[in-house]
C-alpha cells in the first residue's frame, strides 16, 4: 500500500519532534513538554507505523524495543583497546602524577586539565557509521568485549541516529552506563514486591541490566548513558582539545555530565576534588572519585600509554565510606511475597553523616558467602551512598562462641515452613494466604483483573480493610458486610453496594483464574491454564506429587516444588476450602478433545471484535493449543485483528499462516 505523502510527512515530523525532546531531556536537561504530551507523540507515531509498516526505519524512536532474546553475546574486538585508568588515593599521589607529566614534557608552568566525576557504572563503546548506531560493546578485558547492541538500543538517552549533519563517517563514542539512584531504589522496591532478586548497588544493577539476553528486560531498567571519550574516528579530524570533543557529543545528541570543568594546573584539580567530596551525595548517580585528563589532545598523543593505562589521565578516588561496628543480632524479615531476608541489627554508627543501625544481608547465599555472625565486628558501607550493607566481618575480632546463622525452618510471622529451592539465593515462607506478612499483596493479587477481577477493590481500600481488621485473610473478602463498609471514611451506601455486587459477581470464575489468584510462586496465568487443562479438577491438582507435576509441559522442578509445597500447607488448604464454602465456584474443566487447535502455537496481534485478548488466549489453551506473545519459526498461526503490530510483518516474512478473527472462531468450533 502506497503511503500518502501527508502521512509520510507527519511520520517524519513526529520522529524529529520525539528525537528533539529526547535531546532536550537527556542532553540539555531542559525538557519543554510534560511526559504526558511526549507519550501522546510517541503513541501517535507507533499507531502510524503499525498502519504503514513500510515506513519503519531502524533509527525510528519506536524501534528501541522488541528484538528477540539472544542465546549468547557475540565477542567484539576493540580496534583501539579500552584501557582502564591508574588510581591515586591522596593529594601526594595526584601531585606526583602532575610532576611526571611536566617532567616528560619539560614544562615548568601549569597547563590545562579537564576534571570530571568518576562515574561508578559500566564502560560502553558506541560505534556510529554515517550517524547511525551500528554496534555497542562492553569493555570486557579491554581488548575483547561483548556485543550488547540490542540492549543498548533500548536505552532512551542513546541516540539511534546522531543529530545534525556534521558528524564523521565513522566514530566510536565511549562512555558509561549508569542506573541513577532514584531509579535504582524504585527498581529494588518493585522487585521486592514481585519476590524477585534485588541488586546490592546501582553499579551491579547497571551491569546486570546491560547483560540481559532479552532486550525487553533491559528496556524496563532505568539506565542512562554519558559519553566521555572518542575511540575510532574516520572522515573527520580530531579537534584541538578534549573539551571540544565533549562539545561535539552535545551537538550530536550524546549526553555529557554537566559537572565537568576545565582547570589551570593541579591546584584547580584539588579544588574540584574538594568540591565534589562535599557535593557528591547531591548527584543523581554514584561517583567514586574524579577523573583528571590533559585537555590538549596533541599533548595526550605525545604522552601516550604505559602498560594498560594512559599517561595523560588519572583517577583520584574518594576515601571509602565505610565504618566498623558490631552485629548485635541477625533477624529475619518476611517480604510480601514470602521472601525471608536476613537483616543485621547493629550498634549504631555514623556513615557519611547518616546513623546506621540496620543493614541488609540481601539473602542467605550472600550471608554465607560473607560469613557474618552475631557478635562479629563488621565493616558497614552505605552502598550507593543510600542503602546500608555489611561488607564483611573482621575475623581477627570474632568472638570464640560466634555461631553460623542457619536458615530458619519456620516463618517468624506465621510459623509455616521456610524452603530454599536448590539454585536459588532466597528462602521463602510457604505460608502463602495464611501469612500476615504476605496478606496485603495476596489480596491485591487475588482481586486483580486476570484473577478474580473484583472491580473497585483497589490498593487503598485493601489497606483500609486490613487496617480496620475487616479482612484477616483472603476469605474475609467474601464476609464483608455493608454496615461495616459504610462505617469507613468516604464509603457511602452506593459505593458499598457496588463493591459487594462486584464481590458477589467474582464468585463465579474459572479454575485457571482461581489458580492464578492463589498467587503460587511461578504460576502465572499461562501455567494456571496448563494445570487446569491437565487435571480438570482442583482436588486432583492438590494431591499431585512433585514428579507428576514435573511431567507437565512448561513446568520445571522449581515451579513443581512451589505448587506442591503450597497445596500441602495445611493453612492454604483450609483457606481454599473456606473460599469454596463461601460460594467461589467454577465449571469443571472439560478434557481437551481432538481439534484443529490442539498442539498448535498461536500469537495474537491487533484487537479482536468479539473477544478480549485474555478470552482468546484462554479459549486456545482450553482447546489444547498454546498462546504465546512473540512470533518465531515455531509459531503455527498468527491471528490478525484490527490495527495489527509488527508481529504481522514478522509472520509474513517467516511464511507463517495468517488468519483473521472469523477463521479463528471457525477453528474453535472445530
Swiss-Prot record:
One of its GO terms (cellular component) is cytosol. Its cofactor is Mg(2+); Mn(2+). Residues 592-670 form the BRCT domain. It comes from Coxiella burnetii (strain Dugway 5J108-111). This is DNA ligase. Signal peptide: none annotated. The gene is ligA. InterPro entries: BRCT_dom (IPR001357), BRCT_dom_sf (IPR036420), DisA/LigA_HHH (IPR041663), DNA_ligase (IPR001679), DNA_ligase_AS (IPR018239), DNA_ligase_CS (IPR033136), DNAligase_adenylation (IPR013839), DNAligase_N (IPR013840). It catalyses: NAD(+) + (deoxyribonucleotide)n-3'-hydroxyl + 5'-phospho-(deoxyribonucleotide)m = (deoxyribonucleotide)n+m + AMP + beta-nicotinamide D-nucleotide. GO terms for biological process: DNA repair; DNA replication.
Amino acid at each position: 500500500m502506497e503511503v500518502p505523502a501527508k502521512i509520510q510527512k507527519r511520520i517524519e515530523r513526529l520522529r524529529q519532534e520525539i528525537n528533539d525532546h529526547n535531546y532536550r531531556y537527556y542532553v540539555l536537561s531542559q525538557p519543554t513538554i510534560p511526559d504526558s504530551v511526549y507519550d501522546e507523540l510517541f503513541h501517535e507515531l507507533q499507531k502510524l507505523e503499525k498502519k504503514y509498516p513500510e515506513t519503519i526505519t531502524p533509527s525510528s524512536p519506536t524501534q528501541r524495543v522488541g528484538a528477540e532474546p539472544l542465546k549468547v553475546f557475540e565477542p567484539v574486538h576493540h580496534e583501539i583497546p579500552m584501557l582502564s585508568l591508574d588510581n591515586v588515593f591522596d593529594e601526594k599521589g595526584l601531585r606526583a602524577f602532575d610532576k611526571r607529566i611536566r617532567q616528560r614534557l619539560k614544562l615548568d608552568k601549569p597547563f590545562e586539565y579537564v576534571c570530571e566525576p568518576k562515574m561508578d557504572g559500566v564502560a560502553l563503546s558506541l560505534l556510529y557509521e554515517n550517524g547511525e548506531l551500528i554496534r555497542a560493546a562492553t569493555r570486557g578485558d579491554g581488548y575483547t568485549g561483548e556485543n550488547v547492541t540490542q540492549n543498548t538500543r533500548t536505552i532512551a538517552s542513546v541516540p539511534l541516529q546522531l543529530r545534525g549533519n556534521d558528524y564523521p563517517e565513522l566514530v566510536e563514542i565511549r562512555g558509561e552506563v549508569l542506573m541513577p539512584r532514584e531509579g535504582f531504589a524504585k527498581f529494588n522496591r518493585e522487585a521486592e514486591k514481585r519476590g524477585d532478586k534485588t541488586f546490592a548497588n546501582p553499579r551491579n544493577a547497571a551491569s546486570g541490566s546491560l547483560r540481559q539476553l532479552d532486550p525487553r528486560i533491559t528496556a524496563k531498567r532505568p539506565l542512562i548513558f554519558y559519553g566521555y571519550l572518542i575511540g575510532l574516528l574516520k572522515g573527520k579530524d580530531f579537534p584541538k582539545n578534549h573539551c571540544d570533543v565533549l562539545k561535539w557529543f552535545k551537538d550530536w545528541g550524546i549526553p555529557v555530565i554537566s559537572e565537568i570543568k576545565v582547570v589551570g594546573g593541579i591546584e584547580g584539580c584539588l579544588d574540584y576534588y574538594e568540591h565534589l567530596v562535599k557535593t557528591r551525595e547531591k548527584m543523581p548517580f554514584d561517583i567514586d572519585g574524579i577523573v583528571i585528563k590533559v585537555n590538549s589532545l596533541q599533548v595526550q598523543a605525545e604522552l601516550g600509554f604505559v602498560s594498560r593505562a594512559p599517561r595523560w589521565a588519572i583517577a583520584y578516588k574518594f576515601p571509602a565510606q565505610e565504618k566498623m561496628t558490631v552485629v548485635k543480632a541477625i533477624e529475619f524479615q518476611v517480604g510480601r511475597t514470602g521472601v525471608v531476608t536476613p537483616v543485621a541489627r547493629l550498634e549504631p554508627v555514623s556513615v557519611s553523616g547518616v546513623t546506621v543501625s540496620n543493614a541488609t544481608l540481601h539473602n542467605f547465599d550472600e550471608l554465607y558467602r560473607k560469613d557474618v555472625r552475631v557478635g562479629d565486628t563488621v565493616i558497614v558501607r552505605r552502598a550507593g551512598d543510600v542503602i546500608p550493607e555489611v561488607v564483611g566481618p573482621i575475623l581477627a575480632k570474632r568472638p570464640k562462641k560466634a555461631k553460623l546463622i542457619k536458615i530458619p525452618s519456620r516463618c517468624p510471622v506465621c510459623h509455616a515452613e521456610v524452603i530454599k529451592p536448590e539454585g536459588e539465593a532466597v528462602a521463602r515462607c510457604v505460608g502463602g494466604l495464611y501469612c500476615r506478612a504476605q496478606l496485603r499483596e495476596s489480596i491485591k493479587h487475588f482481586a486483580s483483573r486476570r484473577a478474580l477481577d473484583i472491580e473497585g477493590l483497589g490498593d487503598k481500600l485493601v489497606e483500609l480493610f486490613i487496617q480496620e481488621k475487616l479482612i484477616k485473610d483472603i476469605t474475609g473478602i467474601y464476609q464483608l458486610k455493608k454496615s461495616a463498609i459504610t462505617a469507613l471514611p468516604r464509603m457511602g451506601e452506593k459505593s458499598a453496594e457496588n463493591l459487594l455486587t462486584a464481590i458477589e459477581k467474582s464468585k463465579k470464575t474459572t479454575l485457571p483464574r482461581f489458580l492464578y489468584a492463589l498467587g503460587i510462586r511461578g504460576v502465572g496465568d499461562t501455567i494456571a491454564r496448563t494445570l487446569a487443562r491437565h487435571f480438570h479438577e482442583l482436588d486432583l491438582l492438590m494431591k499431585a506429587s512433585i514428579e507428576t507435576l514435573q511431567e507437565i509441559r512448561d513446568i520445571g522442578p522449581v515451579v513443581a516444588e512451589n505448587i506442591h509445597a503450597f497445596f500441602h500447607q495445611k493453612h492454604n488448604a483450609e483457606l481454599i476450602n473456606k473460599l469454596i464454602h463461601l460460594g467461589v465456584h467454577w465449571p469443571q474443566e472439560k478434557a481437551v478433545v481432538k481439534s484443529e487447535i490442539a498442539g498448535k502455537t498461536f500469537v495474537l496481534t491487533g484487537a479482536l471484535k468479539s473477544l478480549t485478548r485474555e478470552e482468546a488466549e484462554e479459549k486456545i489453551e482450553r482447546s489444547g493449543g498454546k498462546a504465546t506473545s512473540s512470533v518465531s519459526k515455531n509459531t503455527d498461526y498468527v491471528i490478525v485483528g484490527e490495527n495489527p503490530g509488527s508481529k504481522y510483518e514478522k509472520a509474513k516474512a517467516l511464511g507463517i499462516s495468517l488468519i483473521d478473527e472469523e477463521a479463528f472462531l471457525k477453528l474453535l468450533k472445530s
